[in-house]
């Protein structure tokens, strides 16, 4: 008996594996530090806005996310007509792949880039090409060397997940200048709100002055709206027009839309979250380093911790040890980092418990 057969390449895709979401045992407090979620939750104003429209769930949302695009435009000084919103930036990444990639094409991502990139690329029959990183950081020269006549798109997370590293804006501009004009450069700025470096830009200036670059962003991180699935993209009008032609007509719900408007306007909530993250990121990097473990310098809301390969001291051993204490971090074998764990910067209590736990783990307790 025959059955439907997936398109070529679909079954070659490794399914995305999210961070663990454990079910707490009775009487045990669990800290989920595996998905880069904010410990503060959404702005109270976003929750209030969500509730205000919750009595009208029978109505379809406004199909173009106009009120949200206008709020984003006001915040960043952008033309709302050059903005598109989606059910998380993941949806937008997939829409870009469907719009600009096909059988026989190639897209480039870096060694430890976000796993959605190869999934989106391979789902449309294109080939994902890996450009090697240097010190867990994007190497512009390696990307440029990977370009072939088949290259149609480059994915660049800046800052990168799961490494937490970034490249300066001058390097991003050098990358754009070195790419053929027909190659679309996608700048994924999901974690840009946490960066305080003077040489960093999320990429809006580059998008505004070119016809072949877009920048995507999300409300899942500093805004704390991951459950609502909201993202957006700023790009040239011709790219926005093309992507809109295949975008679902009601892809952002009304409650999500209004919660996002309130969230982006609550700058005090964002500033508080950014300052807390920076303080505890520095503290965690220093304290974990004192234990003899290497931490990759991060500009995001997480840190990447590297473990020895000695029996009893591995990342798997540490993961099991911490999980027993209700501390859930992210194992990274599927990112090609089998000896590392990624830790979301959590509450003060969670952060201190992780350091205490790692101290006991390294001491063999």
UniProtKB/Swiss-Prot annotation:
The modification N6-(pyridoxal phosphate)lysine is found at residue 221. The gene is hisC2. This is Histidinol-phosphate aminotransferase 2. Pfam families: Aminotran_1_2. One of its GO terms (biological process) is L-histidine biosynthetic process. Its cofactor is pyridoxal 5'-phosphate. Its EC number is 2.6.1.9. PANTHER family: HISTIDINOL-PHOSPHATE AMINOTRANSFERASE, HISTIDINOL-PHOSPHATE AMINOTRANSFERASE 2. Homodimer.
